[in-house]
A protein has these predicted regions:
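Basic nucleic-acid-binding interfaces
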Residues: 1-73
Length: 73
């Protein structure tokens, strides 16, 4: 199993953009990402390093694996 990478909020936004998510709103220190044809949205904090729990939650919401994340780093 691959280890969870250290990812910043901005890097996570770039990764999700490659999978069809687009940043719709930036409020305060958070990006709100949306995918076309979906009412679901993902909130990504603008931190230097996202905690492992936040990364796991974003991966679960976006239906991504660790391998898909590390491929685009």
């Amino acid at each position: 199993m691959t280890h969870l990478p250290v990812v910043s909020g901005f890097e996570m936004v770039k990764i999700l953009t490659r999978f069809g998510w687009t940043p719709k709103i930036q409020t305060g220190s958070q990006y709100i990402m949306k995918k076309q044809g979906s009412t679901f949205r993902i909130v990504i904090p603008q931190h230097r390093e996202l905690r492992p729990g936040i990364i796991h939650q974003i991966m679960k919401e976006a239906d991504l694996s660790i391998e898909q994340i590390t491929k685009y780093l």
